Amino acid sequence: MLRSFPLFIGLRYSLAQKNSLLLSFVSLISVLGVTLGVLILIVALAVINGSIETLRKEALKSTPHVTIAGPGLQANWRELRDLALRSEGVIAAAPFIEAEASITHQGEAAFIAVRGIDTALESSVSEPGSATFVDLLASLGESETGVILGAGLAGQLGVRSSTQVSLLSLGKLLRRRLDEGQGAEVIGFADFGLYSNHNTALMSLTAAERLFANDPGVDIRLRLRVSDINRAGDIAAQVFSDYSELEITPWNEVQASL
């Protein structure tokens, strides 16, 4: 009885007699208004969910699923990587260093994040990329001074493949050690996602260690790729439960808005 009462009221006012045309009209308009409002809400939620998913994919092109940092990692990152690879939920793990630097080309300059990577392992922890990106990583591993720039950054600086650029770590720049910059050859460009295309460059781990030599706070970290990004933090916490000194940062803390 209670379930049919609202239906009874709706039909009563929508199907009123001819002497109640105004009431029927108002009721009909109200029903149509509610229906249209619900439809707009459904469409808006679908668009928002789709946009968030797109932004998440763009962010994960450059943001690690999980970043592991902390004292002692410099010395035993290989053992910790092996531990991660033996653990359930971890697909791949690779070392990297990352710090800020200035890049200069023909009077154009920008401050960027330079990431030093293990070129043999990077493709395993990155979001699935094109065959071109895999080839670029192979070329980067063969070059002592090579660098891969974000496509947006390359356009901003007006550089092409095989162009020479100058790099200087932010630490050395602040200490006015301008003579310790190093040259690098642009071997190609990559899509690092919406958030990083204009401010990211990749170098080999060895070249990046030379660039940031003697800069404080630039230490090796581990990057993990996990099977379930929604549980990234929990998976890493289980893997390194015996290492309380390590700092575990999942992607959704770095990109909290997503």
Placement of each model-derived feature along the sequence:
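Mechanotransmission and gating elements of multispan inner-membrane complexes involved in transport
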Residues: 174, 178-258
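Alpha-helical membrane-interface segments at transmembrane helix boundaries
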Residues: 15, 33, 48, 52, ...
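N-terminal Sec/SRP start-transfer signal
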Residues: 1-39
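Envelope-exposed proteins and targeting segments
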Residues: 62-64, 89, 108-113, 145, ...
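Cytochrome P450 core scaffold surrounding the K-helix E-X-X-R motif
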Residues: 120-129
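Hydrophobic secondary-structure segments that place a key small or acidic residue at a functional site
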Residues: 97, 135-206
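Short amphipathic alpha-helices in soluble, non-transmembrane regions
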Residues: 79-85, 128, 235-243
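Hydrophobic, regular-secondary-structure patches
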Residues: 39-113, 123, 134-143
